[in-house]
Design a protein with these regions (language model features):
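Bacterial N-terminal signal peptides that target proteins for export
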Residues: 1-10
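C-terminal motif of bacterial Sec signal peptides marking the signal peptidase cleavage site
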Residues: 17-21
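Amphipathic/hydrophobic helical signal segments and adjacent flexible N-terminal regions
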Residues: 23-90, 202-211
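Generic short beta-strand segments
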Residues: 75-83, 139-147, 158, 175-183
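N-terminal glycine/threonine-rich, aromatic-flanked beta-hairpin/loop signature
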Residues: 76, 80-124
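Contiguous, well-ordered beta-strand patches that form the walls/edges
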Residues: 104-171
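Glycine-rich, aromatic-bearing surface loops/beta-hairpins
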Residues: 153-211
């Protein structure tokens, strides 16, 4: 066999082996290794102000490249207010309505489907997850639309959800958001929280049960 042909065979084997080494198989999908590098760090999605408040008041958020599987449906009941930088307009003693949410199609640091019972809320970009063992952090940006008296207000928020996943549900759930941008076509007639306002919630009994 000629050296020229041996070279082409060897080159072909290198290409095939290289391609196999670049693939990682999940439960239902195959993605390229290094895909995690395309997942933005939480600091690029969530404003530093909320991250600092979260760290100071709750503790460091769970991090890691191998988060637990958190697929399922859950209910925050009772939904308690924990902390805000606007306690005059947002008193902590108010108990809010229960909040249900569902998570599905989780793959390699991305959650394809995240749905809340608040129908006006829609993620505006990908939903990301990181963590280790049973500890996880979900983070993303969302757009929430309010319609009142014929006027529309559109709020862009940064969202964080952390907790510990267990068979019975999510323990020690914390759920926070910060307003990043506000569009208001009422010329100030409809007053909403301004950009920079943040709000942190928890499940009052420290367990968000599976549904």
């Amino acid at each position: 066999m000629s050296k020229h042909r041996l070279f082409h065979i060897a080159f072909g084997l290198i290409i095939v082996l290289g391609m196999n080494g670049c693939l990682k198989e999940g439960s239902e999908t195959i993605v390229y290794l290094g895909y995690e590098n395309y997942i933005p760090p939480i600091e690029d999605v969530i404003p530093q102000e909320l991250l600092k408040v979260y760290s100071d008041s709750i503790g460091e958020i769970p991090r890691g490249y191998i988060p637990p599987n958190v697929e399922g449906s859950f209910v925050i009941n009772p939904k308690h207010r924990m902390l805000s930088n606007n306690l005059i307009s947002w008193p902590l003693e108010v108990i809010e309505p229960d909040l249900t949410f569902s998570i599905s199609n989780q793959h390699n640091g991305v959650i394809v489907n995240l749905n809340f019972s608040e129908a006006t809320t829609t993620p505006s970009d990908s939903v990301y997850i990181m963590g280790h063992d049973e500890y996880f952090t979900i983070y993303y940006r969302e757009i929430k639309e309010f319609v009142d008296e014929g006027f529309t207000t559109v709020v862009t928020r940064g969202m964080i959800l952390t907790g510990e996943i267990h068979q019975e549900g999510i323990r020690n759930l914390r759920y926070a958001d910060i307003i990043i941008d506000v569009y208001d076509d009422s010329n100030g007639l409809i007053v909403q929280y301004p950009a920079g306002q943040y709000f942190i919630y928890k499940d009052g009994d420290e367990l968000s049960n599976r549904l």
